[in-house]
Amino acid sequence: MNIRALFAILGGSFFVYVGVLHFTDTEWFEPIVPPFLGSAEFWVIASGVVEILVGVMLIIPSIRWMGGFASATLLICLYPANLYMWVNSVELGDGASLSQTGNLVRLVLQLGGIWISLWIAEYEIGKVQKNSH
């Protein structure tokens, strides 16, 4: 197993785990959903489904490259909720909230996650992508 596969499996397992948490502890995630989106429960469940699917894609070798692109896209799409949490000092379902430093660390980790996801997808900036998988 190479290092890229190891990162994909670990990242995929993390996405599946967090996705399952969206079903088992829905109330914990609901405060992060910006009110203008409507039903927080819907968005928590929907994002949980997507996180599980993306995680599975990262784990299965034949579609791992798609999982890399999907996880990068997911991390980009979910960041506005994290930004909402940061700007509005939102408390999670257990009453905890991140400090300014914690939110900054989260941003750096999210950017790193996007980079690793694109690396897993074997994406190279400026190169035409061929589906050789």
Predicted regions and their residues:
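Membrane-interface extramembranous regions
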Residues: 1-133
